[in-house]
Amino acid sequence: MRLWTLGTSIFLRLWGTYVFPRSPSWLDFIQHLGVCCFVAFLSVSLFSAAFYWILPPVALLSSVWMITCVFLCCSKRARCFILLAVLSCGLREGRNALIAAGTGVVIFGHVENIFYNFRGLLDSMTCNLRAKSFSVHFPLLKRYTEAIQWIYGLATPLNLFDDLVSWNQTLVVSLFSPSHALEAHMNDTRGEVLGVLHHMVVTTELLTSVGQKLLALAGLLLILVSTGLFLKRFLGPCGWKYENVYITKQFVRFDEKERHQQRPCVLPLNKKERKKYVIVPSLQLTPKEKKTLGLFFLPVLTYLYMWVLFAAVDYLLYRLISSMNKQFQSLPGLEVHLKLRGEKQGTQGVVHDSAFNISMFEPSCIPKPRLSVSETWVPLSIILLTLIILGLLSSMLMQLKILVSVSFYPKVERERIEYLHAKLLEKRSKQPLREADGKPSLYFKKIHFWFPVLKMIRKKQTIPANEDDL
């Protein structure tokens, strides 16, 4: 408990030093400068971590840090702006940045894996065609050559001029197979298809990389613009009306002060007011905040559907190729018979028979698919968990933005408190008229108005009971 109290007191002291320097003394100025330099260091570190792909050199980062320190020390609006920008990272702007990161993870994971499996399937088909072209042509032609040579060996040479001429005859059989042309055609086709796939993969990676960087820059620009608009509305001519639905501790003190001075007060709030106004700090959501929470999660659900769709396509392709592997491995071999039929003395028969086996699919050409679920959905789960936490804490972050703003501008805070107090009193002054108008409607809701017989029966039951008591 003492440690918590000590930490709270140190934080409040540093917060007060950051918001308003106490005095122009050197000690207070050094404390103020140290706190501003620390906040600037955290901001620059956060920026460099978010945009690591354009990480500038250390000298440039040091220059940016020094410039940020000077701005924070000299400008109250700059100190408020940088804190509001950090808090805005947890609202819609941070949501958009996380969605962009999740989309990049899906494209780099599932889409690239889909192209990889398609390429493996294409390589398997071309490998099997090449292997079958050799395993079918050459055994068949070899048996055909053996059959021709066997026929040639059965032929009886003519010996009409053995005494005059002698010669030796040999049979040379040369084979011509179109397998080389087929292989060249398959290589050309495979090169064209792989070129198209490579072009698609490179284009997808390039578009993803550029799109992710552009979305990150757009997210940073959106954070800065939205923070600037927030400050403009908060400090504008009608700033006391902007997001003025929070009951702060200063509002409670103001209401107690009004009560001590015998003036109208508004606390505690009634049931209807508690649905609209939020007592800070509070985790209870108003109907407006619930609607905002639903709008916060709507893009998340849309992109989640797209991510699941890509994952389903990747998984179905993986299952399809895996089932094809099992079917290819279970296919029986094909036995080919080469029979040479001849006719001798009017009788036909098989004079030569040879057989060889051909496998339907080469085992070395079976595709091996890849599934990258763990590599993709582990970071996606972290991103989704972060989005859920940010969505649930979005109302709390908005409260923090209001509290930070009023800490830097107490004059605006007093105007907001007075306006909200007067607004609540004005609404309560109109409530009696509404309640008077609402009494007949409440009377119409009673059962005995529509069924007076029930009221008469109840009276008859209560009269004898009263007589017994007498």
UniProtKB/Swiss-Prot annotation:
Membrane topology, Cytoplasmic segments: 1-33, 77-97, 231-292, 398-470
Single GO BP term: positive regulation of bone resorption
Extracellular side: 55, 119-209, 314-376
Record InterPro entries: CSR-E3_Ligase_Protein, DC_STAMP-like
Entries under Pfam families matching the protein: DC_STAMP
Name the record gives this protein: Dendritic cell-specific transmembrane protein
Post-translational modification as stated in the protein's UniProt record: Glycosylated.
Reported consequences of knocking out the gene: Mice show a lack of osteoclast and foreign body giant cells multi-nuclear formation and a bone-resorbing efficiency reduction. Mice show increased bone mass. Older (>12 months) mice suffered from multisystemic inflammations in the kidney, lung and salivary gland. Mice show autoimmune symptoms, like dendritic cells (DC) with increased phagocytotic activity and antigen presentation.
GN (gene name): Dcstamp
Entry GO terms, CC: cell surface; endoplasmic reticulum membrane; endoplasmic reticulum-Golgi intermediate compartment membrane; endosome membrane; membrane; plasma membrane
Organism domain of life: Eukaryota
Record note on domains: Several domains are necessary for interacting with OS9. The region in the cytoplasmic tail that is necessary for interaction with OS9, is also required for its transport.
Induction: Up-regulated by IL4/interleukin-4, macrophage colony-stimulating factor (M-CSF), receptor activator of NF-KB ligand (RANKL), lipopolysaccharide (LPS) and toll-like receptor (TLR). Up-regulated by TNFSF11-induced osteoclast differentiation in combination with TNF-alpha. Down-regulated upon dendritic cell (DC) maturation.
Transmembrane segment boundaries: 34-54, 56-76, 98-118, 210-230, 293-313, 377-397
Predominant location category: membrane
Coiled-coil ranges (or none): none
Function, as annotated: Probable cell surface receptor that plays several roles in cellular fusion, cell differentiation, bone and immune homeostasis. Plays a role in TNFSF11-mediated osteoclastogenesis. Cooperates with OCSTAMP in modulating cell-cell fusion in both osteoclasts and foreign body giant cells (FBGCs). Participates in osteoclast bone resorption. Involved in inducing the expression of tartrate-resistant acid phosphatase in osteoclast precursors. Plays a role in haematopoietic stem cell differentiation of bone marrow cells toward the myeloid lineage. Inhibits the development of neutrophilic granulocytes.
Subunit-structure text: Interacts with CREB3. Monomer. Homodimer. Isoform 1 interacts (via the C-terminus cytoplasmic tail) with OS9 isoform 1 (via the C-terminus tail); the interaction induces DCSTAMP redistribution to the endoplasmic reticulum-Golgi intermediate compartment. Isoform 1 interacts (via the C-terminus cytoplasmic tail) with OS9 isoform 2 (via the C-terminus tail).
Membrane topology term: Multi-pass membrane protein
